[in-house]
Design a protein with these regions (language model features):
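ATP-dependent carboxylate-activation loops
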Residues: 82
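Basic, Lys/Arg-enriched alpha-helical interface segments
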Residues: 1-66, 75-79, 87-116
Length: 116
């Protein structure tokens, strides 16, 4: 049973997803299913990004490859998926976080103006 609905914003996630090998796409789908179905999602799959106003990262690991997909909650039911990237360093790159915050703000502005 779903406790939240996963939705995407524009084409950002779809573009990232389409570029990934099938094994990575399968793992992403598995984790998104967990996020949809579990009320309290473990931090190994979904983690708040410190210093942001509500931005989270979906955490995907396949062997030694680590991927992050930015998202946020709209109300308490929706996780909106933004951009994604393959993580190559210990810390999430600041530029990637800034891009995701910009997209999150853009989403809320469009929602407010009824242009979503």
């Amino acid at each position: 049973m779903k406790v939240r609905e996963v939705i995407t914003y524009k084409h950002y996630f779809e573009d990232f997803f389409a570029e990934q090998p099938q094994k990575v796409r399968d793992k992403i789908i598995k984790i998104l299913d967990i996020i949809e179905q579990i009320e309290r999602v473990p931090a190994q799959y979904l983690k708040f990004i410190e210093g942001t106003n509500g931005l989270f990262e979906v955490r995907v690991q396949l062997a030694s490859n680590i991927f992050r997909i930015f998202c946020f909650f709209d109300g308490n039911k929706f996780v909106v998926l933004l951009s994604g990237f393959q993580k190559k360093t210990q810390k999430t790159p600041k530029g990637e976080i800034e891009k995701a915050v910009k997209l999150m703000n853009e989403y809320y502005k469009e929602k407010e103006n009824n242009t979503l």
